[in-house]
């Protein structure tokens, strides 16, 4: 069996690396004021839309701000208070379980899907496009459809299972805390899978075919080729995808808000949903900000380590 | 047509904009007065149509441009917070559920003492004035409440040989029998407003409460609470389906109208929609509205009490039209306008004014006969404590439903669940102490 590589795609990617446009770019690079002018808008956008809200939320988390009040500095009081709250500790646990499970599923299934898409010969474009659908449809909308499918009274999933005589009772998808967690993980995985699959596919396409041929002539089987050629060469892509997805998954709001509102008894609350309830619905902006910033130091460390890994892997190339 | 070049256009518009900015107000042409009102979508949509009609009528009389924005009730909390944070938005706003907003947004709501005093005598006085005064002031007008009777299936009760269940224990018995024939009892126990309402009603009916009159002491740890929790555990395991843990505010309506539930603790909205949509009992040609009846909210061993969403209306003090807004409130709260509005809402929207609880609509259909009775035993959600931002947070975080659910599902013992709720509530009340 031979893994196919789409040579055309590789050639195109390689071609994109060069592309000399000497005259104009030389002028622009040398002209420092012009460069600043071009960077300016993006810089100000970042400053006002990212840096300012971030610093503000940092301040909120260290203050006793409520809706309408700027509040005064209280140090780490909000964080201490959160650690005393049963709901928050539950939220912390949920977030870790949710992110770990969803990421694992997305990585494994995403890899499988990418390998399948890679080997696809007929209707390639159509199928690759269709795979992206869950990622494109607005989450609030698609999750609502999932809610209809799992809704306790009219669940079409239960109806189907019962009609096929697989079960003879209604499975409490959303009322049972563990099944509810399973359901939100399932929907998150469904939504995030295309991102993994398509990005990994791009990585696969970029792996030179000669490496597989060399491995094959050295006697490596399909599994050996996967572990010793595909995985190492995909590592940088994989690291970036997992990094991005970890951040997005941890910050998920829509899926939980639409499906469970954090219930039953807070067993599916995530940082974003709990922060929303605490900060906006109850007006405790300081504490709400503390919830959403709680993982910031940990995330920062993860980003640091992963980016280092990526850089190392790139150098290895 | 004279052609305007791009340059001319830019010069004129930029000049105009600069002028407007310098003056700090819009040019005279645009200076029509405008009053804006943020409200929530009613479960009986005719209510909103009548409100809009009155608002427009008032606007036409006073030469004021009016704009009524109606949003889903779940969006209101975030919208209010955003408007206060930005100190801008609508002039008039719906507030609630609960009177806690008056405390939470105390510094941002205009005083309504004059309006409250004006409108009360014309309508027979406020139902329970002391409940609505927050820190001794009228910061909002209590607007409407949907009282929570028991909505029941008379045909199923007849089948079971049950005459008139009146206590919570009666409903456990009925629910058990109903569940055995595929028609369980239904009350939400998850993160929804209905769960708060019904479980608080049960807690009080068994003699329990969560906060004392002083608004400080957490009183949840009591033998009455334990009794209420044991009752709810039996109700959940013996008379209901586990799906109630994931119900939202519309689920019990669906359960009744789908012909599944034997009874739900809910306002008349389920019946209203069944009637409007001509829903039939599954497998028959019979309209389900014909076999629905509404009876009194159940009694417990200690009391008969219930609560509901106390929907209110207020005026932001950062509004530039406080006086105009007050004028509209006076207009809307005139007896004839309130009467029309209650009529339009088929009584779902009962005002907190004595005369309106005796509105003819409650006699027009035998379905509504218990609604004024239920209103008499309806108390604010923080009862017997005052309405505060803290009590609002207990409601928003669903502490009461979660306490009951954690015990009912066997996740915690009664003592553990109570200890959990007590600690959460103590933290909430301690964290909400007002700055001196």
Q: Model regions: which residues?
A:
Chain A
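Transmembrane alpha-helical segments of polytopic membrane transport and secretion proteins
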Residues: 1-39, 122-124, 307-317
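A structural signal for multi-pass alpha-helical bundles of membrane permease subunits
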Residues: 34-317
């Amino acid at each position: 069996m031979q893994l196919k590589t789409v040579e055309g795609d590789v050639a195109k990617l390689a071609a994109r690396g060069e592309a000399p446009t000497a005259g104009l770019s030389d002028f622009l690079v040398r002209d420092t004021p012009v460069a600043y002018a071009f960077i300016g808008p993006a810089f100000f956008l970042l400053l006002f839309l990212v840096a300012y809200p971030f610093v503000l939320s940092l301040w909120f988390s260290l203050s006793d701000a409520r809706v309408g009040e700027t509040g005064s500095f209280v140090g780490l009081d909000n964080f201490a208070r959160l650690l005393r709250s049963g709901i928050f500790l539950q939220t912390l646990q949920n977030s870790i379980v949710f992110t770990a499970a969803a990421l694992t599923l997305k990585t494994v299934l995403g890899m499988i899907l990418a390998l399948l898409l890679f080997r696809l010969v007929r209707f390639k474009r159509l199928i690759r496009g269709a795979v992206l659908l869950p990622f494109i449809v607005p989450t609030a909308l698609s999750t609502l459809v999932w809610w209809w499918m799992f809704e306790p009274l009219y669940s079409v999933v239960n109806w189907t299972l019962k009609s096929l005589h697989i079960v003879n009772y209604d499975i409490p998808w959303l009322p049972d805390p563990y099944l509810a967690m399973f359901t939100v993980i399932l929907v998150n995985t469904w939504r995030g899978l295309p991102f993994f699959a398509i990005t990994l596919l791009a990585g696969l396409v970029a792996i030179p075919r000669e490496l597989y041929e060399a491995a094959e002539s050295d006697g490596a089987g399909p599994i050996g080729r996967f572990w010793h050629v595909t995985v190492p060469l995909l590592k940088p892509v994989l690291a970036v995808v997992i990094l991005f997805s970890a951040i997005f998954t941890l910050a998920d709001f829509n899926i939980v808000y639409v499906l469970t509102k954090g219930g039953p008894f807070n067993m599916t609350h995530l940082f974003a949903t709990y922060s929303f309830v605490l900060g906006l619905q109850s007006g405790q902006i300081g504490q709400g900000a503390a919830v959403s910033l709680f993982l910031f130091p940990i995330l920062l460390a993860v980003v640091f380590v992963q980016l280092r890994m990526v850089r190392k892997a790139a150098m290895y190339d | 047509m004279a052609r305007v070049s791009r340059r001319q256009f830019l010069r004129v518009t930029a000049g105009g904009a600069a002028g407007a900015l310098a003056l700090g107000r819009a040019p005279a042409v645009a200076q029509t007065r405008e009053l804006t009102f943020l409200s929530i979508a009613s479960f009986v949509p005719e209510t909103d149509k009548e409100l809009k009609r009155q608002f427009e009528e008032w606007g036409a009389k006073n030469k004021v441009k009016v704009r009524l924005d109606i949003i889903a009730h779940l969006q209101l909390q975030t919208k209010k917070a955003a408007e206060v944070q930005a100190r801008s938005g609508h002039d008039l706003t719906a507030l609630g559920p609960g009177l806690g907003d008056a405390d939470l947004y105390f510094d941002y709501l205009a005083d309504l003492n004059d309006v409250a005093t004006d409108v009360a005598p014309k309508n027979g006085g406020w139902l329970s004035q002391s409940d609505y005064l927050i820190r001794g002031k009228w910061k909002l007008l209590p607007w409407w409440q949907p009282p929570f009777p028991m909505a029941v299936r008379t045909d199923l009760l007849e089948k079971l040989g049950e005459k008139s269940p009146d206590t919570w224990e009666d409903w456990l018995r009925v629910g058990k029998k109903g569940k055995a024939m595929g028609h369980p009892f239904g009350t939400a126990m998850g993160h929804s407003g209905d769960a708060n309402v019904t479980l608080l009603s049960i807690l009080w009916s068994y003699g329990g409460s969560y906060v004392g009159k002083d608004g400080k002491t957490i009183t949840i740890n009591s033998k009455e609470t334990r009794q209420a929790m044991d009752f709810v555990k039996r109700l959940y395991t013996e008379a209901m389906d586990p799906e109630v843990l994931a119900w939202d505010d519309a689920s019990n309506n669906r359960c009744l109208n789908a012909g599944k539930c034997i009874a739900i603790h809910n306002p008349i909205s389920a019946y209203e929609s069944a009637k409007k949509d001509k829903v039939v009992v599954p497998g028959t040609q019979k309209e389900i509205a014909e076999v629905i009846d509404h009876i009194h909210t159940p009694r417990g061993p200690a009391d008969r009490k219930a609560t509901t969403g106390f929907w209110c209306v207020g005026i932001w003090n950062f509004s530039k039209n406080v006086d105009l807004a007050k004028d509209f409130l006076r207009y809307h709260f005139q007896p004839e306008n309130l009467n029309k509005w209650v009529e339009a809402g088929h009584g779902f929207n009962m005002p907190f004014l004595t005369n309106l609880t005796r509105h003819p609509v409650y006699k027009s259909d035998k379905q509504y006969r218990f609604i004024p009775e239920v209103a008499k035993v309806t108390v604010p959600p923080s009862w017997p404590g005052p309405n505060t931002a803290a009590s609002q947070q207990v409601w928003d975080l669903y502490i009461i439903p979660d306490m009951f659910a954690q015990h009912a599902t066997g996740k915690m013992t009664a003592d553990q669940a109570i200890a959990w709720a007590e600690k959460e509530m103590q933290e909430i009340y301690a964290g909400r102490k007002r700055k001196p």
